[in-house]
Amino acid sequence: MQIKVINETNKTVQIFQCAKVKHRALAWLCDVFLLAIVLVVIFLITQAFSDNRFLLFLVLSCSQTILWTVYFIFLPFFWDGKTLFRNLLKIKLFAFDKRFLRIMIHELFLWILLSVLFLVIASYFFINQNSSEALNFFTNLDKPNAIAITIRTITILISFLQLIFIGYFCFSSEKQALQEILSNTFMVQEKHTLKSKPTSLKTNNQPDPANLPGVIALDEVEKLIN
């Protein structure tokens, strides 16, 4: 799938090729892994200064949101649609208009799925002082409770949405992925072809009535009479 961008200023046409699945997946996984390392560092630093699990959960939740927003929204907005690993793999996120809004919609699609999992599951683990009790709270089917059922339902729905996303993503090589269709963006290869815009010459195709067959100009009639 090719994307053509016409520049009216210098009369050129840029032709981009949509990125392959392996490049997009590798860039995204490496970017997420990088943010996970930063979150682990924040976790260790916070834990060294405080044993309050609720404070630890609050710090990690805020840190996750801030890191994701800065790295996946603001950085691509100011860096031509690229993150660190997108730049290394020579791909970028392209949008024709409303770039900030398009990028935000593109990244929020995945951020919501991962954040809901983090907030729903991690909240109880960080607040509860006994991790084994927390695990038993979710896995004990003999004593079902409303909270556990709700969390399981949300987890199943999110997992189902993730399977749809991954399945569509696997068959979208050199095409738009699902979140790109929803945000009207394109993950393209940085290398592109530059061509001159073809110019069409405007010609006046209206015929002169005097030259049409069967039409005689008035001055010619006067010459014949005289």
Curated annotation (Swiss-Prot):
What Pfam families would the database entry show? RDD
Q: Which InterPro entries does the entry mention? A: RDD (IPR010432)
Q: Which residues form a coiled coil?
A: none
**Membrane-spanning intervals of the chain:** 25-45, 54-74, 107-127, 153-173
Identify the main location.
membrane
Cellular component terms (Gene Ontology): plasma membrane
The subcellular localization recorded is: Cell membrane
**Topological relation to the membrane, as annotated:** Multi-pass membrane protein
Q: Keywords in alphabetical order, please.
A: Cell membrane, Membrane, Transmembrane, Transmembrane helix
Q: What is this protein called?
A: Uncharacterized protein MG243
The root-end lineage is: Bacteria, Bacillati, Mycoplasmatota, Mycoplasmoidales, Mycoplasmoidaceae
